[in-house]
Amino acid sequence: MTKNNEVGWNLDNSYATLPQSFYTEIPPTPVSSPELVKLNHSLAISLGFNPEELKKEAEIAIFAGNALPEGAHPLAQAYAGHQFGHFNMLGDGRALLIGEQITPSGKRFDIQLKGSGPTPYSRRGDGRAALGPMLREYIISEAMYALDIPTTRSLAVVTTGEPTYRETKLPGAILTRVASSHIRVGTFQYAAARGSIEDLQSLADYTIKRHYPEIEAHENRYTALLQEVIKKQASLIAKWQLVGFIHGVMNTDNITISGETIDYGPCAFMDNYDQGTVFSSIDTQGRYAYGNQPYMAAWDLARLAESLIPILHEDEEEALKIAQDEISKFSVQYEKQWFIGMKKKLGLFSNEEQDQSLIEQLFKMMEKYKADYTNTFRSLTLDTLENTPLFDSPEFKEWYKLWQSRLEKQEESKENAYEMMKNNNPSIIPRNHRVEEALEAAVTNGDYSVMEKLLEALANPYAYSTDQEEYCVPPAPTNRPYRTFCGT
């Protein structure tokens, strides 16, 4: 173990206080010649680290799993999951939680190495990760953070000096992922499937203490836990939909109890507005299509409610009723959050009867004319309506008049309305073709400058600066249809 207080390590291991069935203690598998290729300076500082120290050989060895910091307690977490509707016992097959960093402000964050070698949950996998998918997770998770969407984050990426074999031979890498925790709906499914009410209660109590301490004294804290998670997920999915983010693999093991977005495998951002948009190569039925995401979140949360039934009430029928009642509230909460967000995207402060219809009409036209989702709202925000099939259409011109007269009805000025739009309509998203361009340069040519430039632009998505304009251009028809892969 390395001991260096100048670096800023301040690890605790509260997860290891849970019953041992929830994890397996296992060290990372060392790699031959690690090199640091990306460090997140601002995140490092917020976690209490000295970024300059993290660039030193001793700390790079930690990011690679070749050494452990003082206080580390590496473990692979066990969990289950419905993967495309099919239930499996799973677990961290290529990741290890090395500990929980306590920040200078007293907050607790999991520090996880992703690609750190095989574990008892690897299911015949090699436990490793390729450089491309790890850089991709870094780019997208940091873009999500800048968009103000709850997310896990990326502290560092190191190359391992060893190949990883997928369809082809690829350079290996390890990502250091930071999360409020890695407790998932699947963690509760795992506890329930094992059949021990004591273990299930231990997990629920731990989760409440860690994420929702304000409900500890609630008369039925387990019902309150379900309510809190539903609230968090309703807000999260609304935020995804509002920026056109498609997760791609909303299995129950990828739904966090903290309400953070996790697992950036086959995710992507929508170009042309289409409710049926799917990018993931393995989602052949469109289960996790853009328009299905709210329904799939409700489905996943119903699996959480099922898992909690043994502790919701001593009477099983009453417990089932509580679970059903709570799950039925998700769609109302989601729709409310989405509607509030959409009104902000259109500069609407007050409530008017026509608002729902105004929004619906816009989306019908966007779908009809295959309008770019992000750029449509960007153009409305800037009030610069370029020559596009949507903006040139007679029905849009009619809609635009209605919208303008709706803005004029408000007490707030139009300037204030456009300012609110600017704060809610990103000018830039991680366009799929731009992300691929950055990954190609880094992985194939060892040129990280394309990625650095992209990350710099993505860090301020609401800036509307001229430097970002090149990143606002939608992909050429030759870059479509875009397909994503999970990288495992």
Swiss-Prot record:
It comes from the Bacteria. Belongs to the SELO family. Its EC number is 2.7.7.-, 2.7.7.108. Nucleotidyltransferase involved in the post-translational modification of proteins. It can catalyze the addition of adenosine monophosphate (AMP) or uridine monophosphate (UMP) to a protein, resulting in modifications known as AMPylation and UMPylation. One of its GO terms (molecular function) is ATP binding. This is Protein nucleotidyltransferase YdiU. InterPro entries: SelO. It is an enzyme of class 2 (transferase). ATP binds at residues 91, 93-94, 114, 126-127, 177, 184, 263. Its cofactor is Mg(2+); Mn(2+). Keywords: ATP-binding, Magnesium, Manganese, Metal-binding, Nucleotide-binding, Nucleotidyltransferase, Transferase. Mg(2+) binds at residues 254, 263. Pfam families: SelO. The active site is at 253 (proton acceptor). It catalyses: L-seryl-[protein] + ATP = 3-O-(5'-adenylyl)-L-seryl-[protein] + diphosphate; L-threonyl-[protein] + ATP = 3-O-(5'-adenylyl)-L-threonyl-[protein] + diphosphate; L-tyrosyl-[protein] + ATP = O-(5'-adenylyl)-L-tyrosyl-[protein] + diphosphate; L-histidyl-[protein] + UTP = N(tele)-(5'-uridylyl)-L-histidyl-[protein] + diphosphate.
